[in-house]
Structures are given as C-alpha cells and as structure tokens.
A protein has these predicted regions:
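N-terminal leader/linker segments that initiate helical-solenoid repeat arrays
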Residues: 2-55
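Helix-turn-helix repeat elements of alpha-solenoid scaffolds
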Residues: 13-15, 44-58, 84-101, 139
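Flexible helix-coil transition and linker loops at the boundaries of alpha-helical arrays
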Residues: 22-26, 61-69, 101-113
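Residues that mark the junctions of alpha-helical repeat units in TPR/alpha-solenoid scaffolds
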Residues: 25, 32, 51, 71, ...
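"A position-specific structural signal for the A-helix of alpha-solenoid helical repeats
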Residues: 31, 38, 70, 77, ...
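Short, charge-rich amphipathic alpha-helical segments embedded
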Residues: 54-83, 108
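Short coil/linker segments at helix-helix boundaries
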Residues: 69, 88-105, 124-139
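Short, charged, amphipathic alpha-helical segments
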Residues: 73-75, 114-115, 138-139
C-alpha cells in the first residue's frame, strides 16, 4: 500500500506538468483574454475609448478560432469602441463585414445580428455626416 501511495505521489508532478503544457495553455490564454476584457470595461467607464479598442484587439487575437460567437460579440464591441475613438471608417467596414457574416451563417444569435445592424446603421449615419463635413457631394 505504501508503494502505491509513493508511486502516485511521485507521478503527481508529471501529471501536473503534462496538464500545464497541454490543456492548461488554452486556459492560460483564455484567462489572459478575460483579464484584457475586464481592463477594457474599466477603461470604458473612464471614457478612454482608444485604450478600450486596443484591449479588445488584443483579446480578440488571444481567443481561439473555435469560439465563434464570443469572437463575433467581441468584434461588435471593438467596432463600437472604434466609433467612439474617432476610427469611424474602420468601424464602419468592420460592422459591415460582421453583419454580412452573421446573415450568411443564419445560425448565430438574432440579438447579436440586430445589435450589429443597429451599430452599422449608426456608423452609416455618422459616415454620411462626416462625408458632408469634408465637402463630398451627396450621392
């Protein structure tokens, strides 16, 4: 009995290292992304939208491709932050791409699609005003 306990005790570090180097890496990147999202929320409360957009971009790079719905929600929030940080043309293109992607899938969240359409419509409105302020003729 003592040998079995000793063998288990000696194998425990090997199991821990195997977990850390395997599935633990994914958990660590998810934790890092979560930390960035919390920072973005804190910065949003301070109206520091350019920093919020940077945190969202970093978190988006860390998220795995399999997390489609979370990535789409994050892309929407990134575009909203870009709109508020004077990056309107970039946000408008990103929202257009997101709306097209959500319509093609058809399986995704309808509320997310409605939110993306609403944000895209707002960006279109402000893009129109921006073009008028720059002196471009009406189409």
């Amino acid at each position: 009995m003592k040998r079995i306990i000793l063998v288990i005790w000696l194998l425990l570090p090997a199991v821990a290292i195997a977990y850390h180097l395997g599935p633990g890496q994914k958990q660590m990147t998810m934790d890092q992304a979560n930390r960035l999202l919390r920072e973005a929320e804190e910065l949003a409360a301070l109206d520091s939208w350019s920093q919020v957009a940077l945190r969202y971009e970093e978190a988006l790079q860390l998220l795995p491709k399999e997390e489609v719905l979370i990535r789409q929600q994050l892309r929407l929030e990134l575009a909203k932050a870009q709109m508020l940080s004077s990056q309107l043309p970039v946000a408008h293109r990103a929202l257009g791409d997101l709306v097209d992607e959500l319509k093609e899938e058809g399986v995704g969240s309808q509320t997310l699609l409605q939110e993306a359409r609403s944000a895209h419509a707002n960006s279109q409105y402000y893009m129109t005003w921006l073009m008028r302020l720059e002196g471009q003729p009406e189409e």
